[in-house]
Amino acid sequence: MFELMDKAPADPIMGITELYNKDTSPTKINLSMGVFKDEQGNTPLLDCVKEAEAKIYATEDTKAYSAIEGFSSFNDAVLPLIFGADHEAVTSGRSATIHTPGGSGALRIVGDFLTKLSPSNTIWVSDPTWVNHINIFETAGLQVKRYPYFDKMTNGLAFGTMMSALKDIPAGDTVLFHGCCHNPTGVDPSNDQWQQISDLIHGNGLMPVLDFAYQGFAEGIREDGEGPLKLVQPGKEALICGSFSKNFALYNERTGSLTAVAADAAAVNIATSQIKSVIRAIYSSPPAHGGIIVSTILNNPELRTQWESELKQMRERIQNMRQLLAETLTAKGVPGDHSFITRQRGMFSFSGLNPTQVEQLKNDHSIYIVGNGRINVAAITPDNCDALCEAIANVS
């Protein structure tokens, strides 16, 4: 049977890293994968994670299954991390968090949950969006449609065009938003724009899903939620997918969360029961170790403070590399105003490079970026920025 199948195409992001790994050039640069790197080009293990793991090793006495929803110590710590402990959605008891295998796992659960229970099988995603959004939701059985988001002329948010498109979405459909640090553009709505988005979404009877994969990477934990959490209005529903790959640097632990917000506590209990039913049919219970690390850190004041300090260092390094990238592109004579790079937020910059230029960078300079021109700014270092910008100048 297998020999009769067609070979699946390489993943548009993971496949680039496979090519990079085969490249023998000593000066090769990989800016495709969404991972943070330090100034030496390494993806670090946070000190707070090391200390948490030491505590876990000293006290852990079982590897028994967790519950379908994961450990309560994780879920009870993550819920106020997302909202803040005094947020109405927390204090009212109308929200609940479930531990998932990464943010991708949370998104897939959302897809299956909506396919099973939503009156509409359509979800709307931004154009552009993270490429795996489409793969995840279509595989779950949803119809994926796009709403305009990015203005290529200004390298900013196409807010008016987006709002016009959102107004035309039929009631009952689901709309996915990026919580902060939009992937791939790095362009986020302002807090006032988030309020307008929220009023439109709930006024028109749409279901918001928030992909909150980069909390803490734009301005800070609380600051990054101030705008997007306006989607969580009293008495209204929402689904929030979280990831701890980036802000805890737990990439290979696959640690994420899914938070359901309902009209009241009784309704959220119904929703979580259905989510658990979906989970049981996929993986039964989440991998424990990453969640135990996160809960150990969040529930220990000293480790929590240390984590926030290390998160700040990562955030500031990315901001510094944005500034360096913009300045070096200008110094190398690359046409255009590059100040937009410093206004974008998070790990990614939508560079404006076209597919031909991306191929030239790979073939002529051993520089690997995603085909749509997305650059992982968090993988730029003071040592490779000059060579990167020189290569971009050569293909511009």
Question: Over which residues does each language-model region extend?
Answer:
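Short Gly/Ser/Thr- and Asp/Glu-enriched loop/turn motifs at secondary-structure junctions
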Residues: 93-94, 341-346, 370-373
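Conserved core of the PLP fold type I
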Residues: 50, 54-55, 60-205, 215-217, ...
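Conserved PLP-binding catalytic core of the aspartate aminotransferase-like
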Residues: 308-364
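Hydrophobic beta-strand scaffold residues
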Residues: 31, 144, 208, 238, ...
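Active-site PLP attachment segment
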Residues: 227-270, 274
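Structural signature of PLP-dependent enzymes
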Residues: 272-290, 297-326
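N-terminal "arm"/small-domain region of PLP-dependent enzymes with the aminotransferase-like
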Residues: 1-70, 77-80, 281, 287, ...
